[in-house]
């Protein structure tokens, strides 16, 4: 397969003829919607899929909520080595907070397809946001952490999980060493029971980077303790921030360049976003809120509004602008 960028005057039939492939394959591979209009600048996968190729020749994992569409997960899971099921929380006493829907069907799909199901642990408060006070209580209190680890091992054994992903954000700077010690303790306990441990890391570019997202995580120590790490190389462009690429390649490169100085590259997984944002303009900090959209949805917005999709060479990201029915300007990254 190769990537073809749509030019003015293109149609699915014309592209299919140029590449000597069935039009149906272009429609299927790119999730095109009848009557199959295209946007100038749209990137299309063109060519026949090699059915003999190993779908897991790239080591890949993905996060999924328990309410994900059954059809979507069934289409995706053959390509995943690991499925990170999102998510379990915990209380101040170390009791588990279960996902909103039972995830047994997802674990069953993993087992059918040879994919490892991974329990994602998050410190969400009652408001659904990361709670650093909850983290502090866990990492500084052995009674709480022992209770939580007992509960985790029980559930993981009972449900058939293969590992755990520790996805903690906004860790207090003063809890940095305590968090590392908690991860080391978790790894020891999980290894005793045959489980692997990964840790999600905010995208740092230096050891002394300031900010609540960064100061509580020691790249070197966490990378040494965990079996693998996920660099969260996304969300530069975010719902309440100014319009920009979600994962600008120039910024991603800076994170990776630093990470490999602290962590064994063989342990590093790179986060790749599968979504974008639609910002109304002008952007007003504290007021403007972007709408989260999927990749296919973004293309449909461009088509419906006659927008040409452009490409930012520095960020290596597509974007476009359009006017909605009320005359409001928008930019999509």
Question: Predicted regions span which residues?
Answer:
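Primarily a LysM-type cell-wall glycan-binding module
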Residues: 1-21, 42-44
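Second-shell loop/turn segments in exported
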Residues: 12, 92-97, 134-142, 168-176, ...
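Glycan-recognition patch characteristic of GH18 chitinases/ENGases
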Residues: 48-147, 151
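Hydrophobic faces of well-ordered beta-strands that scaffold small-molecule active sites
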Residues: 60-62, 81-85, 117-121, 164-166, ...
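Active-site groove signature of glycoside hydrolases
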Residues: 84-87, 147-178, 228-242
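Substrate-binding surface in catalytic domains of secreted glycosidases
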Residues: 92-101, 176-304
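Glycan-binding loop/region signatures in secreted carbohydrate-active enzymes
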Residues: 123-130, 134, 276-333
